[in-house]
Amino acid sequence: MSTISPDEQMQSGDFEAPQSKILCSGTNSYLITEMCGEGAFGKVVKAVNMATSQEVAIKILKREDAARREMWMLKAVSALDPTKSNVVDFIERFQDGGQTCLVFERLDMNLYQLLQQRRGHPLNLSEIRPIAHQLLTTFAALESIGVIHTDLKPDNVMLVNHEREPFRVKLIDFGVSFMRSENTRGMKTQPIGFRSPEVTLGLPVSEAIDMWGLGCILLFLYLANHPFSVDCEYQGMKGIVDMLGQPDDDFLKAGIYSHQFFMEDKHWCNPGWSIKTPSEFESGTGIQVKEWAGDIGSLNDLITLHPVLNGSIELQDRRAFVSLLKGLLQIDPRRRLTPQRGLSHPFLTMVHLMDNMESPYVMHCLDSMGVLDLDDYDDEEDFCSDVVAEEDPWVEEASVVPQSEDTGSAPPHSSVRVEELDPPCDETAAAGSSDVVAEEDPWVEEASVGAQSEDTGSAPPHSSVRVEELDPPCDDTAAESQQLPDAAQETQLCEDTRPARVSRLKRMRKFFGRIVKRVKRLFR
């Protein structure tokens, strides 16, 4: 939401001067102290409960349908503990002057304002890590109740109290959220610049769109700039293709809007898709393409983007961060990290830093994680699920020890071996992949639905794509299994040793949990 100046506050016809306006519910009276901002659905003000002196934020909605929608989602989210799940605490709803008022706890500033306060200086990894952990925890909680936020952007992630609890954050604004069970195919949700490929191209959506949005936010914090265009949908899609690669052909065939952004060549022996030029997009849609130039060409550029101040330890941490981003920014939502798998990623567990516990860099990283609520850390089992152990390629990639800057030789090996972090080795998954895809991938079922014709507006003939032709999530491991002569034996070995490796990973998580809690106590 945009900031409103004092002059605009005084001239507004909907509000009196903030110092004199009182909003009354059935049980409480709130004195408005400041106008915060205005959006499409309403205005937000800061206020004080006149009876208890509690500071609150009040969202005053213009439209009743928007109010009903947001209340419905807030009731669903109220099943969660707002502190443990890092969502804004909703207090009450009331009517005042025919307008619906929603009262929330008062928070500090949002992430966009934080970067403004830092004068455009990006966050470092020790600051990004606790934010990533908290938001992954939030989305794991939302996933458990079937809620998709859909509006993840820096403005909707707020610091609780940055002075007392640095980088403690909460997620706000459920005004355009929806339930997993709702039919949302073709809905243009998510802000441009944080919009996932499946939303842009018109495929069915899932909780995976929030994981994409999270990846964009973490990248935004590290760059101190938007990674993709925020005001041109074409440039947003082209930026994704330039940085991450083009969506697979079967993915494009399934999209309602794919023909707006891509051209399908059917005249060659090997037909395929290619992204349109700006002029082709403009002539086909009538929408003018805006200029955009990104900061990086690929995610790997992030490793050396900023000066390295802590040698190979920091480089290793950057590689882990890039690995996390690659998991969150997978174009295919079936391959994208889930919240639980994200929480088990080495960048969050910091297992790659274990051999350098006395390093000032590592101690600073541990200190920054002290903002997390780790009272039950030792008892958590979800973070090290079998799914992560069997399927997560990002764990293996982030565990590779980087080369030393000075000598080019590898630094001392970590006691955490790559094989202990469970690289993907489940060749048997490929055999049953068709069933898995058919059961779990909502957009596959509708892959035969063609895009609307640009010229006539009529639907073209159904695509010949079949479920069994689509690449399953584990197709890379399936290809490897065909090349290895002893694949069956290797699979059996992996299955025999997996429980021990999962147990070791759990012990490492508990070890780090105890360390973080000790550091947290030292700094109290």
Model-derived features: positions:
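Conserved N-lobe ATP-binding subsite of Hanks-type protein kinase domains
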Residues: 43
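A conserved loop-to-beta-strand element in the N-lobe of protein kinase catalytic cores
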Residues: 96-105, 112-113
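Conserved HxN/HPN-centered segment at the entrance to the catalytic loop
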Residues: 81-92
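Catalytic-loop of the protein kinase fold
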Residues: 143-161
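Activation segment signature within eukaryotic-like protein kinase domains
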Residues: 131-132
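C-terminal lobe substrate-recognition/regulatory segment of protein kinase catalytic domains
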Residues: 248-324
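Regulatory extensions flanking the kinase catalytic core
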Residues: 335-376
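Activation segment/activation loop of eukaryotic-type protein kinase catalytic domains
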Residues: 155-191
